Swiss-Prot record:
Protein name: Chromophore lyase CpcT/CpeT
Pfam family, one: CpeT
Family indicated by similarity: Belongs to the CpcT/CpeT biliprotein lyase family.
Organism: Synechococcus sp. (strain WH8020)
Enzyme Commission identifier(s): 4.-.-.-
EC supergroup of this enzyme: lyase
Amino acid sequence: MTATIGHFLQNLCGEYSNQKQAFENPPLFAHIFLRYKPIEHLQPGSILLEQTYAVDPKHPYRLRVIRAEELTSGIIKLWNHTFKEPDRFSSATFDQDCREKIREEDLILLDHCHYQVRQLDDGFHGELEPGCRCIVRRDGKETYLVSSFHLQGDELSTLDRGHDPQTHDRCWGSIAGKFHFQRISHWAENIPETWL
């Protein structure tokens, strides 16, 4: 792995909450936890991503494995994977035994749903690869995902929206702008030294 990826993962890994935003604007923003935990026994750069609502912390509504790879100097690609059986690994973020059972064959690569990340003066900026080809089925309808994030220090902002493939109108996602998360736990110490 490269120094660029190591630096990115050290900045990323941890637990984040948008509690302040959710409490100030409860009709517009749910209280959500984002968690990024290294999966040491998989390929270098493999991170477990969990998203849960604060009201239901033991049942993630999104569970992914992202894998960081530097394609060209300074540009990181985050390969995005889902689980064949996500319920088997719903406790993996905090349960090491469960996490150690994750195997490559448990994962499904999500075509066209990978991120490109660049480090700029104000932190790391990530965007879904262009092309409007990351298809998300929501409420019985196919939409394409437009997604971005900005990581600076202990602050992480994200914006995910689904659009109609024909009209390009927004079908779902935040109507009030970005979600703003604050890191509440650092997990960089869980990154294997061989990754850095």
